[in-house]
Amino acid sequence: MSMLMAVKTTSLCCSSLNLTASPTFRRNPRAARLVNPTARIQTRFHRLIEEQGIVLMPGCYDALSAAIVQQTGFSAGFISGYALSASLLGKPDFGLLTPPEMAATARSVCASAPNIPIIADADTGGGNALNIQRTVKDLIAAGAAGCFLEDQAWPKKCGHMRGKQVIPAEEHAAKIASARDAIGDSDFFLVARTDVRATSAKSGLEDAIARVNLYMEAGADASFVEAPRDDDELKEIGKRTKGYRVCNMIEGGVTPLHTPDELKEMGFHLIVHPLTALYASTRALVDVLKTLKENGSTRDHLQKMATFEEFNSLVDLDSWFELEARYSNLRNALGTTKS
C-alpha cells in the first residue's frame, strides 16, 4: 500500500491516536530510507546546535529587522508567518499569507543578513504533499536555511490562538517525506511542527509527542510541539520526543517564558522568539506617533529614537559612498592610475 493510499484509507482521531501501532506507515516500502536520513547530513543548523548546545533565534519580518538581528550578534534568525502577515498584509495570522509571499520575503531577508542562517515559517506548506515540494524548493532558492512545516488544517491560525484543527498524522508524515525528497542534498533544516496539543485538553500532549516522533521518522531534522501549557509539559516533551527539539517563546502566549539555559536543561535545542521584535517595534511606533500627534514635534522623544547617524550606519551607508566614488569614472572602476 502506498503512502498516499494509506493517507486516504486511514482515519485517525486526535483523541484516540495510536501511532505506536501504525502499520500503514511502517509497511511503506520507503520506510527504511525515511528514518531521518539527515542524521548524516551536517546542515548549518546541525553545526550550530552541536557547537552551541542551544541556539536562540529572534524573529524578523523584513530586510531591516533581519539586518538588526545579524548586527546584534545572533547566530540565526527566523521569519515568522505571524509577523509577516502583520507587516506585509496588515492582517492576523489566519491563513492569509501565501507561500510565494514568504519566499519573496525570505530572499530579501537572507540577502540582508547573509552571515547567519535563516529559518522560514512554511506554515502548512501551501497544500498537500505535492504542493510542499514547490514551497520547499522556492525557500531553498531564496536562500533560507530551513523551514517549519506544521500539521494544521487549512486555513491555519497562530499556534497560540483558539479554534485550531489538525490533519491526520500520516497525511502530515507524507508531507514531511515529500519535503525531505525536495530538499535532497541541499543545506536545509526541516522542522516538523504539531499543533494537536490545543485540540484536546485530555490527550493533546500524548498525541503531540506521538505525532512529532512519527514526523521524525518521516525525515524531519527537528520536532516542534507547539503551545505546551506549563513546565511539566515542557519537561515531558524534552524527555519523550526524538531528535533536536524546538521551543517557541511568545510573549503573552500560553507557554511560560524561559531562558535558553532553562530550556536546555529541559532538553531543547532551538529557542525561537518569533514576535519579540514585532511587538517591541509596534509599541515604539505607536508611542512616537502618539507623541507626534499630541505635540506636533518629536523633540522630546529623540532619546527613544535611533539617530540619523546610527540608522545610516545600520544600513551601511558608508560602503555605498565608497562604491559611488569607485565607479565615478572608468579609471577608478578599473583600479588604474594615470601614468
From Swiss-Prot:
PROSITE patterns: ISOCITRATE_LYASE. It catalyses: 1-carboxyvinyl carboxyphosphonate + H(+) = 3-(hydrohydroxyphosphoryl)pyruvate + CO2. It is found in: Plastid, Chloroplast. The keyword Metal-binding does not apply. Disulfide bonds: none annotated. The keyword Transferase applies. Its EC number is 2.7.8.23. Residues 1-30 form a transit peptide. GO terms for molecular function: carboxyvinyl-carboxyphosphonate phosphorylmutase activity; oxo-acid-lyase activity. Keywords: Chloroplast, Plastid, Transferase, Transit peptide. One of its GO terms (cellular component) is chloroplast stroma. Pfam families: PEP_mutase (PF13714). InterPro entries: ICL/PEPM, Isocitrate_lyase_ph_CS, Pyrv/PenolPyrv_kinase-like_dom, Pyrv_kinase-like_dom_sf. Belongs to the isocitrate lyase/PEP mutase superfamily. This is Carboxyvinyl-carboxyphosphonate phosphorylmutase, chloroplastic.
